Structure formats: C-alpha cells, structure tokens
Amino acid sequence: MPQFDPSSFPSQIVWLVIALVAMYFVMSRLAIPRLAEVLEQRQRLINDDLKQAEALKAETEAAIAAYETALAEARARAHDEIRAVTEAAAKAAEARNAEVAKALNTRIKDGEARIVQARDEALTHVREVAGAVASDIVGKLAGLRVDDAALTAAVAAAIKE
C-alpha cells in the first residue's frame, strides 16, 4: 500500500496541509458565514415571533379585561332590570289584589245586605204566620177570640226571647 510507504510521507503531508488549508478557506469563507447567517436569521425570526407573541398576549389580556368589564356591567344591568321588572310585577300584582279585594268586599257587603233583608222579610213573615197560627191555636183550643194587637205583642215578645 502506497499510503504506508514512508518515502511518500512528505508529499502526503504536503497534500494534507494543502487540502486542510483549502477546506479551511472554503469553510471560513463560504459555509460558516452561510451557517452564521442562517442562525442569525433564525434567531431574528424567533425574537420577532417572541415579540409578536408578547404583543398578542398583551392584546389578549386587554381584550379579556375589557370582556370581563363588559360582562360585569351587563350582569349589573341585567340584575337592575330584573329587580325593576320584579318590583313592577309586584306592584301590579298588589294593585290587582287590591282591586280584587275591593270587588270581593263589595260583593260581600251586597251579600250581607241581601241576607239581612231576607232575614228581616222572613222575620216579618214569621211574625205574621206566628200570629195567625197562635190565633188559630187559641181559637181551636180555648175557643176564644184574641185581639190582633195583643197577639202581635205576645209574638214579638216571644221572638225577642
């Protein structure tokens, strides 16, 4: 093998140095700057993405805060409207109950008046019937004829007891 022949070592070392120097210049002038440029570009993109993410995060937090504020205001308005509607409904129900109670009281008073009137009519008829029955009983049992004024007074006294 010629690579292991010691007489060819100096020429191999020269070519090794030439190849390494050529590779060094190619790498230092072409490959490494391109790699450095790619790495810098990648780092710039990462930094830009991070800045954009921070800006979007801040914007999102502001939007969330605005949303929560709007939601709290909407809840407060809804509670106020519900309370107002509830109060209005309670007032309307109270007014309706008052109207119904007034109508019922009027009907009750009318009914009581009719009952009193019917009772008074019944009592007057009872007095007349009681007077007629008492007159007939006294006439049939005792065979006497009783004065109508005395008979009416006796029936009135008996009804009062």
Swiss-Prot record:
<keyword id="KW-0472">Membrane</keyword>
<feature type="transmembrane region" description="Helical">
    <location>
        <begin position="13"/>
        <end position="33"/>
    </location>
</feature>
<dbReference type="InterPro" id="IPR002146">
    <property type="entry name" value="ATP_synth_b/b'su_bac/chlpt"/>
</dbReference>
<dbReference type="Pfam" id="PF00430">
    <property type="entry name" value="ATP-synt_B"/>
</dbReference>
<keyword id="KW-0813">Transport</keyword>
<keyword id="KW-0375">Hydrogen ion transport</keyword>
<dbReference type="InterPro" id="IPR050059">
    <property type="entry name" value="ATP_synthase_B_chain"/>
</dbReference>
<dbReference type="GO" id="GO:0005886">
    <property type="term" value="C:plasma membrane"/>
</dbReference>
<comment type="function">
    <text>Component of the F(0) channel, it forms part of the peripheral stalk, linking F(1) to F(0). The b'-subunit is a diverged and duplicated form of b found in plants and photosynthetic bacteria.</text>
</comment>
<dbReference type="GO" id="GO:0006086">
    <property type="term" value="P:pyruvate decarboxylation to acetyl-CoA"/>
</dbReference>
<comment type="similarity">
    <text>Belongs to the ATPase B chain family.</text>
</comment>
<dbReference type="GO" id="GO:0046961">
    <property type="term" value="F:proton-transporting ATPase activity, rotational mechanism"/>
</dbReference>
<keyword id="KW-0066">ATP synthesis</keyword>
<dbReference type="GO" id="GO:0046933">
    <property type="term" value="F:proton-transporting ATP synthase activity, rotational mechanism"/>
</dbReference>
<keyword id="KW-0406">Ion transport</keyword>
<comment type="subunit">
    <text>F-type ATPases have 2 components, F(1) - the catalytic core - and F(0) - the membrane proton channel. F(1) has five subunits: alpha(3), beta(3), gamma(1), delta(1), epsilon(1). F(0) has four main subunits: a(1), b(1), b'(1) and c(10-14). The alpha and beta chains form an alternating ring which encloses part of the gamma chain. F(1) is attached to F(0) by a central stalk formed by the gamma and epsilon chains, while a peripheral stalk is formed by the delta, b and b' chains.</text>
</comment>
<comment type="function">
    <text>F(1)F(0) ATP synthase produces ATP from ADP in the presence of a proton or sodium gradient. F-type ATPases consist of two structural domains, F(1) containing the extramembraneous catalytic core and F(0) containing the membrane proton channel, linked together by a central stalk and a peripheral stalk. During catalysis, ATP synthesis in the catalytic domain of F(1) is coupled via a rotary mechanism of the central stalk subunits to proton translocation.</text>
</comment>
<keyword id="KW-0138">CF(0)</keyword>
<dbReference type="GO" id="GO:0045259">
    <property type="term" value="C:proton-transporting ATP synthase complex"/>
</dbReference>
<dbReference type="GO" id="GO:0042717">
    <property type="term" value="C:plasma membrane-derived chromatophore membrane"/>
</dbReference>
<protein>
    <recommendedName>
        <fullName>ATP synthase subunit b'</fullName>
    </recommendedName>
</protein>
<keyword id="KW-1133">Transmembrane helix</keyword>
<keyword id="KW-0812">Transmembrane</keyword>
